Amino acid sequence: MKVSDDLDASLEQRADYIPTEKLVQETATDSVLFATVRKALLSSGLKTLVGPRGCGKTHMMRYAWLTCQGDTSKPFAVYVSFNKYYRLEPLLVSRASPPDEFHAWALGLVVLATYSSLSYKAENATAVSELEAKVGLPRANLETLVSALERNQPLSAEQAALSRDISVNRVQKLLDLACSSTGRKRTVLLLDDAALTLTPTYLIEFLDIVRALKSSTIAPKASVYPGTTEYSARFHAGQDSTAIFVWLSVEAAEYQSDMDQIARCRFSDFDQIPQDVVDLLRFAAFGIPRAYLTMLQDFKERPAKTTQQTLNQVVEAHLNARLGEFRSIARKVPKLRELISVGETVLNGMVRAVKASNTDSTVVQLLVGVPKEDLTAIVQRMFQLLIEAGLVFDAMEVKHGTPERIYQRFIPHGAALLQS
């Protein structure tokens, strides 16, 4: 498969590219994990949705937002994507007060998304105009401000004044007014692509904004990546927020049924695909629905060869893409180059260890244990990078032996195990 074809196939499986009308029919609503996450997204309180790229965070957020639009028994929902955050990186060196302008950009996107949610129903068009007048944050002006910040353009006097006027208090007031106008009692704020991993300075600022927006009537939900998400001195995971993990372990009891439900929603001929193919690609997907869908699509579209040849090529292409993405971190953040290199070496060592442990065993063993005392800060950082990239699954710690020792357990990527 060509690189361009691989990209096209991946984009087809991204929830960002699924039209709203198809989102519902392509959602596995009976999935155990999905039901848990959907409930958390619509609940009160601040939650972080934790999982690597492709595990369904965007899909779940967009679906939760959509189900709230026509159901007044549910909260007023606002969906915001921050996937263009990297465009603000130049501001860190070109502006005198980049955090202030980042605040204006982030809060501006929340306001614009609120207007969009309110106007989703045509009958609410006048409510948006009234809201703009009440809070003094005109939609058109905000759009030009956000655009200027994303293009690193100098702000006009009017835009600079508007950027100073956008405060957390004003945005909270707007959210409460919008919520009230729809007859709802509270708002869920679905903040997607909130990890901002390549710009830690902005991530810290962003999480402070999220924490500040939280109120008795506003419940922010932020999607973040596992492993590398840094929390600010004022944002404490576990105290300020509850983490909801959306990455399903290949060892979970519901793994097969959940993954296959997702595939069945996307492929009408899923049940005609040979079972051995499904089983292998499901394992190779390593709990990432987008990977599963992309590999199934790749298998279906490849020129006819032997099934085993085709499977090997599909899994190899997927693994190479994942490793390529992991290696690209070293180019984007040069100071991490050595950690990335060592991380790949450790991944390969874990794969060899798992393979060796299963040579003469009748029970498949996927776990690799690392003594907790060996997890120095730098070693932990290396594992965090592997986890964020979805190459290693954190299976939590366990206590063993006498005297008792604590081991951190990890599972190396399924595709790497299959290709070893």
Locate each region found by the language model:
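Amphipathic alpha-helical "lid/sensor" segments that cap RecA-like P-loop NTPase cores
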Residues: 274-335
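The catalytic "switch" region of P-loop NTPases
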Residues: 166-190, 194-286
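Conserved beta-strand -> loop -> alpha-helix junction used to position metal-binding or nucleic-acid-contacting
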Residues: 75-84, 244, 310-321
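C-terminal leucine-rich, beta-strand-based interaction scaffolds used for sensing/assembly
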Residues: 82-83, 315-420
